């Protein structure tokens, strides 16, 4: 397949770079294949707009380290009323006025990324993190940030229709805006008092994505995904497991769906720092402790399983930009905080944890490869 061939060229090119001025590479047969299917990076462009040139440059950088996916977080609730939707939309008043992507350029961007072996996973984060939708139409809201999906609410059907129409605008028709075979439905951080309501909503959006639009649903693993040890949703989604306080990480391994290790112990970066997350990653600690089988959140809670566990399909880093619009962070500052952690995740979720190589040795090798 194209992606495998492309990643093979990265291996050859990296081998040449490592040889310095020799411009030769050893003759023979090489086998270089990933231990896990996905290496993903989530960019929150809703809280801080990132121009298209930056997204394209980031694709090229991530592809050098054989990342497979870039998730683009297109809407979010933010601070000081700064909630944004970053796509051109047919819905009056929804599109951000301080930076957005036209449908055409976003469609072209996905094809551009495919040339570099990268799949773009677009995300609409609902039913929480939805202030931008509620600000535009108050009939959708349970409060200022949560869509009203309560089973006994008069607004429920309005919300469900809104979501169906929103999905159709970007995934329907003969020339859809979202062209890749996966879509992230969000599901992050809804009020935990409404588990059954959330479960039904989860079933609804995943059915639309999978059965109507033929895409693999991806989501943040949160309440509503499981009920004790008995699944209530289908087995085809891929879940980002991020925090034990959002859902029992141990319970996820009793379900049928696949898991991406997106735990916030090492996988969350917030430029400027916020809510206990670092401004810059502790890279040496990350290198020494990151493991595909360690599902531990920033509080240390969670579960450890063996590397290579059949339910683990990859790892993910998330750049949240909680305060990015207010603390003067530029896209160059964002890159400075992410540049050196991509190789660590690439190593961990391609080859696996290397206990025989010190961080200093690893860093020297990365510096040799350059960008």
Outline where the language-model segments fall.
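Active-site neighborhood of glycoside hydrolase catalytic domains
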Residues: 143-257
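Short secondary-structure boundary/capping segments
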Residues: 88, 136-139, 201-202, 275-278, ...
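Extracytoplasmic/secreted cell-surface and envelope-processing proteins
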Residues: 79-82, 129-132, 193-195, 227-229, ...
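Flexible, acidic glycine-rich loops studded with aromatic residues
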Residues: 231-237, 244-371
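Active-site beta-loop-alpha junctions enriched in small/polar residues
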Residues: 46, 75-79, 123-129, 188-190, ...
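Hydrophobic faces of well-ordered beta-strands that scaffold small-molecule active sites
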Residues: 39-43, 70-72, 120-124, 183-185, ...
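Feature activates predominantly on carbohydrate-active enzymes
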Residues: 2-150, 154-182, 208, 320-323
